[in-house]
């Protein structure tokens, strides 16, 4: 696997379909080695979830949307929250992606948990933010919170992602 550069990412963002759409400011969000993804919505997690081998018993945790204040800010107490991103990704069958939190989150006592973005996946992804700071953490709507790193696969996958999260949150 080879990590894509800013130049390669720009070409793919401008392609049809775009690698990443609904960007707030492409020039700001395109970084030397990835695309910064932004905050659309935060939800609480207030019920248990479940996962099994064949997904017959899968149950997603329920939660409520936390509203931004009149200035566009949310204060998060220590804990775990779901995050919905602004951007929609359209990953071709010769790429995959992984995400890392922006270092500012870590310096403030918060981090993100994410999964792999599979070749062929399209959708508006969710991830999890964990606030470790005992005093909490403040986030503004549209804040750049993660960097999505795209990797070129040695060969294109025969069949791209086709799971239940395909085209999610669009």
UniProtKB/Swiss-Prot annotation:
Keywords: Hydrolase, Nucleotide metabolism. It catalyses: dUTP + H2O = dUMP + diphosphate + H(+). One of its GO terms (molecular function) is dUTP diphosphatase activity. HAMAP family: dUTPase_arch (MF_00635). This enzyme is involved in nucleotide metabolism: it produces dUMP, the immediate precursor of thymidine nucleotides and it decreases the intracellular concentration of dUTP so that uracil cannot be incorporated into DNA. Belongs to the dCTP deaminase family. Archaeal dUTPase subfamily. This is Probable deoxyuridine 5'-triphosphate nucleotidohydrolase. It comes from Methanococcoides burtonii (strain DSM 6242 / NBRC 107633 / OCM 468 / ACE-M). The lineage of its organism: Archaea, Methanobacteriati, Methanobacteriota, Stenosarchaea group, Methanomicrobia.
């Amino acid at each position: 696997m080879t990590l894509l550069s800013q130049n390669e990412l720009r070409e793919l963002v401008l392609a049809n379909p775009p690698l990443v759409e609904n960007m707030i400011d492409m020039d700001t969000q395109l970084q030397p080695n990835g695309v910064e993804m932004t905050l659309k919505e935060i939800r609480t997690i207030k019920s248990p979830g479940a996962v099994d081998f064949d997904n017959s018993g899968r149950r997603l945790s329920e939660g409520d949307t936390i509203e931004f204040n009149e200035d566009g800010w949310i204060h998060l107490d220590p804990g775990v929250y779901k995050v919905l991103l602004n951007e929609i990704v359209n990953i071709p069958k010769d790429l995959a992606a992984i995400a890392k939190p922006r270092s500012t989150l870590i310096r403030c006592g918060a981090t993100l948990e994410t999964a792999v973005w599979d070749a062929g996946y399209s959708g508006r992804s969710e991830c999890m933010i964990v606030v470790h700071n005992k005093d909490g953490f403040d986030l503004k709507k549209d804040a750049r919170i993660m960097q999505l790193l795209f990797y070129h696969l040695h060969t294109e996958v025969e069949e791209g992602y086709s799971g239940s999260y395909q085209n999610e949150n669009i």
